[in-house]
Amino acid sequence: MLNVQLKRKRTFAQSVLFVVFLLSSTLAFAQNKVTGTVTDKSGEPLAGVNVLEKGTTNGCITDLDGKYSIEVKRGQTLIFTFIGFTKKEVQVNQSAINVVMEEDSQTLDEVVVVGYGSMTRKDVTSSITTVKADDLNVGVYTNPAQLLQGKVPGLTIANTSDPNGSASISLRGTSSLREGAAMEPYYVIDGVPGVSLSLIAPEDIESIDVLRDASATAIYGSKAANGVIIVTTKKGSKNGKTNVNYSGYVAIDNTLKTLDMMNASELLAYANANNVDLSPYYDVNNPADTNWQDEVLRSGFSHNHNISINGGNEKTTYSASLNYIDREGVVRGTSMDRITARSFLQTKTLKDHLDLSVSVNASITNKQTASTENQGRSVLDAMYYYNPLVPVKNADGSWYANTSISQSYNPLSMVYEDQYKTKEKMLQGIAKATLHIIDGLDWNLNLSYQNEQYIYSNYNTTQSQLPNISSRHGQASRSTKENIKKQMETYVNYDHVFADKHKLGLMAGYSWEQNDDNDGFGLTAYNFYDDYLKYYNMGLANNMDIDGINSDNKLSTLRMISFYGRVNYSFNSKYLFQATIRRDGSSAFGKNNRWGTFPSVSLAWRITEENFMKNQKVFDDLKFRIGYGVSGNSLGFDAYTAQQTYGASGWFTYVDPVTGSSSSYRTLAATKNANPDLKWERTGMFNVGIDFGFFNNRLTGTIEYYDKRTKDLIYDYPVSTNRYPYGTMTANVGEISNKGIELTINATPVMTNNFTWNTTLNIAHNKNNVESLSNDTYSVNYRDYGNPDVGGYATTNVQRLMEGSPVGQFYVWEWAGYNEDGGSIFNDYDTEGNLIGTTDAPDDGDRRKAGSAQPKVTFGWNNAFTYKNWSLTAF
């Protein structure tokens, strides 16, 4: 019995060993070493090609000779991938597999959005930078333009510490002397010009195309002098599935560096050493040690949440999203929150001959700001000059106020007792129709309506320390404003290829636009019983400020009509030509110059398509571009820019000679002179560039040179009131030039089966210069501006606008140290410009140039690291 069992056990063990041996033999037989060489269609070996067993992490990379070796089972599939070539899959059925890879034209065939249409990258003749959604900056941003920071050569974005502050944006240098919209690029969202960026959440953006030279921007005519930024939003999918996505970001903002200010003990030591008596300015028996920067500044916590849904099929697509952002400023009392909603629906009808779409965008923004601008009323100003020896609050809980100095406003008092809030409501509706008439011929109609409502609410409490307000026992101001924008655009596109070599594109269109702006009213009331109701019930105030009625909101209607066209021609994808023209008419300008014409022309030569380049191994892509165009600037000008206007100038009292009763009446006075010859600012730009690609397009780039000149600058010039009813005239005088060079490099230094490193570097140099400021009619030597709004320097401008210098030229006194009394002294110059000593009372002749606000060089370096399903971006 025992023997039998042992035998059975032995037999079972032998069986197991046999099966294991059999499986091992089978595996050893099935495992196969595959070798081969990977080449392009010309037979050149490709180094760095990824070879991966499908569905596994088993892989290798080809060597410098294009050779590879990999252990893989028969019947499995190998995947060959390489930048600039299409992916190739090969089934393993032998031990030697050579692969020929085909070039991928996807990069060159990438669709680029241009004005009133799109084209492939290889057909572009002008300077256009495209940034896809995956390449945009991520984080908590209040302005979608900030997503481009460091991504586009020549695009400069200056942010503020206030979350409600508008970022200052310029492209290829300053081209206007006006402020605000007149200095910034023009925005086009989903083909609709002039849309507010506040209506678009960053997560809804699919791509952004930046038109940088005039040959690209001239199609937008009088609004494109500072470049055009075209935003394309995400639409629905056609896969028949409904997709729901969520994304969220959390950020903390901090002041990078605070000023090194004296603390209480250091200030006392300095005062004792220099015989300065500080006793009138603090309680000598109970001195404080207040760090006012720590009291005013904070870490600003921000968070952003976005949820979206999209789906559809081949006939109908839809999408919707909801975004919420809440951002704290680094200055206490400053914050911003916004909720944005967006919906989109598109469908095909009439047997797919008619595309219809409708979208609705809406946003509600709440802003709270502190006083950070007015000299003597600035929280930041007071933060620096307020005495560290005094406390934040008195013993009774009230805000400390040092009445022994001229500017006694406690910065924390201004944060909490002087409140400035704004509510913005925006709504936009867009309807589009595209009729496919015949193959290649489309008719388009775009209709847009945008409504903007603003409510400004200010309240200075009964504890406010501000001058002319603290005695009013609470003051409330409230004003409203509404802007309405209506647009209609219709245009026809025709694209056709003749004889496989001649590619022709034609576009012609018409647009109409009307802006009804500044429809509003405002009121100021004061002397409240308490601070509870603030501006919510101003009827409870004991006094109404008649002079405080908001008179700035004057309804204006501005209209513009335009005709435009474009022609594109390509011969054998080798020689490229584009020409555009636009004619705009605007009621903003003088009756003698309401129409302007803006043409452009550009050429390109794809050198790598020439026969003599077919056998070269250096360039994968080489294209030469040259172009010139003229665009204008009508942004920031209202319906009354060229009109004679009058406004309230005061009051006069009329006494009835019969009854003796008196009445007060408003007096009117001229506030602007009429200029029937006022016309567009015109910017002409010459651009030449080279696009290149090496190493199977693992290294690509662009180098460009431009010369941009803006003439007929619009500015206010002094005139004689003996001839005109008002002392200044808005006129076309002066010229600004911008010359620069830009370089962009895109590279993939590392690409393995699991890890990829993509890097992009852009560098730009721009030289800005004011060529002239005067003509035979209007003349000015220079203009001083740039008031620092710092206590003690209320009338001291630090910048000067003058010929031969850039816009933003600093023109200041040269600090030379301290005198024996501890006061600042400055270099003293004679009338010939010779340094003759120092002075504690410098005059205007002692000012000297000290750099410029215009950056000499801007650059951005972006890196993206991907490991399997993880990604890291660094900027």
Which residue ranges define each predicted feature?
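Conserved small-residue
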Residues: 245-286, 521-523, 527, 640, ...
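Short, small/polar-rich motifs associated with maturation and membrane association
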Residues: 1-343, 348-349, 354-357, 363, ...
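Extracellular/periplasmic, surface-exposed regions of secreted and cell-surface proteins
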Residues: 136, 184-186, 300-303, 338-339, ...
